[in-house]
Amino acid sequence: SGLLEPYEGQAGYDKLPVFRPCMEQNPAPEKYPFILCAGGRRPQFFHSRTYRVPWLANLEPHTLASLNPADAERLGIQDGGRLKVKTPIGERTYLAETVPGVLPGVIYIVHDDEGDQNVNDLIAADYLDPLSGFPGYRCYFCRVEPAGGAR
């Protein structure tokens, strides 16, 4: 168009976005083989105010960690059982939910604005997108293992 070309490359970034798999940034792939996808929402919890509506909160009183059934079977984790998620900066225990739609090698945890299950605490504060500065909620790295116990 002639409008943007004079400015291309001036900020020191690629002219077009380039996909970089998050596991390339993983400091220890053998120790943290899973991708942690965090910050999603459940339909009943769209805004923080809906967390405080008792009948909505009772629909799902615990934060769930969703993983592929094949991963759960391989790790010995039962649907409704407890699993532990470990990252380089911390660990949390969640109830497991097996979901065929979750890709193998990925664990999906919705955000929880209160309590000791806050998945944001598992992601390093300086793990940011280099271009936008946005936190890397959708693509961090972790280890998943059974924690014992059931719902």
Positions of predicted regions on the chain:
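Long, low-complexity segments enriched in small/aliphatic residues
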Residues: 1-55
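Long, contiguous, secondary-structure-rich segments that constitute the structural scaffold
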Residues: 52-66, 70-151
